[in-house]
């Protein structure tokens, strides 16, 4: 009689190798060389040696996981946050701020084939004036989770503190948690958003089921005791103000009101310096006509209008156009106009573009401005400032300007998000 045996499961032992890191990529990963290609290792810094296991091996690069760090770089820091390494918010708290800035500047310089002239930075801690915290009720423990997502996961890290938040928001975290835990409807909460505006703190609560009268009363009492403005979001496209006043923030001496859903730069200090540097680079003269593309609600547009003869702000989101017009009225600026346009279309054919522009500023989203560059070139401005949140699309769009006879005069790295992998920048182009 034949006897059959099941094949033994093959056990693969991953080889441990020892490598020395010689670089840090902009995402905070150590970079070593192995078998003639780049090896990316989270957790190791330049000058550090470690025993690592390769977890992914591609043709052009590989990834590895640290098993043991054999020495410490002089630029290694003790992370301030107890959640670092688990929370997906920060990737570089283990590296000195100087090292973070050097690695990001080097990556930007390589992409742009141009030296970074300056790093525009502010305080590296307590800088974030906006935070969205996920909420999740756990029936077994009857507890409410409140925090940020884990790195590479939808799981929530229960956050008790966050040292990159502005101090007012970090101090508020335990009290917000206690308030929300006490509500009867906390099984139906999606997230809570906190924003530190110029006139105080605002809070937005996303809930997926109606709040009863008791919960609404508790929330109102909480908002009054904390002195914050409270908004409820029963649906993703509905915002109900419950207490407080409309928020605003300062931009180069002007007051800009905004809705809790509007985009604002989360780093107030760097935003102020960025706007000031843009005005300086463009060298605005009293007779200049200036165009601001992807203008939002006027973060750059309105400060430009304090110096130029006239400014046109163009934006693809109608609500932001209305907010820009409102902010111009509130600040008494009569030489600025806002228009809602599809920025992929030829804006040079619009009535407001007939007289041309001396200077142009653009601040697009991560996708960049590929469809807009040819129209900018047709307008033939003397100077262009491009503010970017994605160096890859910035490099692509810059090629169009360089091929049209513009030159890069200044390149700056904006340290808008210290301790993270986000790299922002701004470039000054000048027509030859």
UniProtKB/Swiss-Prot annotation:
Q: Which InterPro entries match?
A: 23S_rRNA_MeTrfase_RlmD, MeTrfase_TrmA_AS, MeTrfase_TrmA_CS, NA-bd_OB-fold, SAM-dependent_MTases_sf, TRAM_dom, U5_MeTrfase_fam
Task: Tell me the enzyme class.
Answer: transferase
Enzyme Commission number, as recorded: 2.1.1.190
Q: Which cysteines are joined by disulfide bonds?
A: none
Every TRAM domain range: 10-68
Give one Pfam hit by family name: TRAM
The lineage's top-level taxon is Bacteria
Q: Where does [4Fe-4S] cluster bind?
A: 81, 87, 90, 162
Could you confirm whether the keyword Lyase appears in this record?
no
* GO BP term, pick one: rRNA base methylation
* Positions of S-adenosyl-L-methionine binding: 265, 294, 299, 315, 342, 363
The protein's annotated catalytic reaction(s) are: uridine(1939) in 23S rRNA + S-adenosyl-L-methionine = 5-methyluridine(1939) in 23S rRNA + S-adenosyl-L-homocysteine + H(+)
Where in the sequence is the active site? 389
Q: Give a GO molecular function annotation for the protein.
A: 4 iron, 4 sulfur cluster binding
Q: Which UniProt keywords apply?
A: 4Fe-4S, Iron, Iron-sulfur, Metal-binding, Methyltransferase, rRNA processing, S-adenosyl-L-methionine, Transferase
- PANTHER family, sorted: 23S RRNA (URACIL(1939)-C(5))-METHYLTRANSFERASE RLMD (PTHR11061:SF49), RNA M5U METHYLTRANSFERASE (PTHR11061)
Q: Which family does it belong to?
A: Belongs to the class I-like SAM-binding methyltransferase superfamily. RNA M5U methyltransferase family. RlmD subfamily.
Q: Could you tell me what this protein does?
A: Catalyzes the formation of 5-methyl-uridine at position 1939 (m5U1939) in 23S rRNA.
Q: What is this protein called?
A: 23S rRNA (uracil(1939)-C(5))-methyltransferase RlmD
Q: Which organism is it from?
A: Citrobacter koseri (strain ATCC BAA-895 / CDC 4225-83 / SGSC4696)
């Amino acid at each position: 009689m034949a006897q059959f045996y099941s094949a033994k499961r093959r056990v693969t032992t991953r080889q441990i190798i020892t490598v020395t890191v010689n670089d840090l990529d902009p995402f905070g990963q150590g970079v070593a060389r192995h078998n003639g290609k780049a090896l990316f290792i989270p957790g190791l810094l330049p000058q550090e040696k470690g025993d690592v296991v390769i977890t992914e091996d591609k043709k052009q690069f590989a990834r590895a996981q640290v098993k043991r760090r054999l020495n410490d770089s002089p630029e290694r820091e003790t992370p301030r946050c107890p959640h670092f390494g688990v929370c997906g918010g920060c990737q570089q708290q283990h590296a000195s701020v100087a090292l973070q800035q050097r690695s990001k500047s080097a990556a930007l310089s390589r992409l742009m084939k141009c030296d970074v002239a300056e790093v525009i930075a502010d305080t590296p801690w307590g800088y974030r004036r906006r935070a969205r915290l996920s909420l999740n009720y756990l029936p077994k423990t009857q507890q409410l989770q409140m925090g940020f997502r884990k790195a590479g996961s939808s799981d929530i890290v229960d956050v008790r503190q966050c040292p990159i938040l502005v101090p007012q928001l970090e101090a508020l975290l335990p009290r917000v948690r206690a308030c929300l835990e006490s509500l009867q409807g906390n099984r139906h909460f999606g997230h809570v958003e906190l924003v530190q505006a110029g006139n105080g703190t605002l809070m937005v609560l996303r809930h997926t089921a109606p709040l009863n009268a008791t919960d609404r009363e508790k929330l109102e009492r909480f908002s009054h005791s904390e002195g914050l403005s409270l908004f409820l979001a029963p649906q993703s496209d509905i915002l109900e103000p419950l207490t407080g006043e409309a928020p605003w923030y300062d931009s180069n001496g002007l007051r800009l009101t905004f809705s809790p859903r509007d985009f604002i730069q989360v780093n107030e200090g760097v935003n102020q310096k960025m706007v000031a540097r843009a005005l300086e680079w463009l060298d605005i003269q009293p007779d200049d006509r200036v165009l601001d593309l992807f203008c939002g609600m006027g973060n750059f547009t309105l400060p430009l209008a304090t110096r130029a003869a006239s400014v046109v702000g163009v934006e693809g989101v109608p609500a932001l156009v209305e907010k820009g017009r409102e902010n111009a009225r509130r600040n008494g600026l009569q030489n600025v106009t806002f228009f809602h346009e599809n920025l992929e279309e030829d804006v040079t054919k619009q009535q407001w573009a007939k007289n041309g522009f001396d200077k142009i500023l653009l601040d697009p989203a991560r996708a960049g401005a590929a469809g807009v560059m040819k129209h900018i070139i047709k307008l033939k401005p003397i100077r262009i400032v491009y503010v970017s949140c994605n160096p890859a699309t910035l490099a692509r769009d810059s090629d169009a300007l360089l091929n049209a006879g513009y030159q890069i005069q200044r390149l700056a790295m904006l340290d808008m998000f210290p301790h993270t992998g986000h790299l922002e920048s701004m470039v000054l182009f000048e027509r030859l």
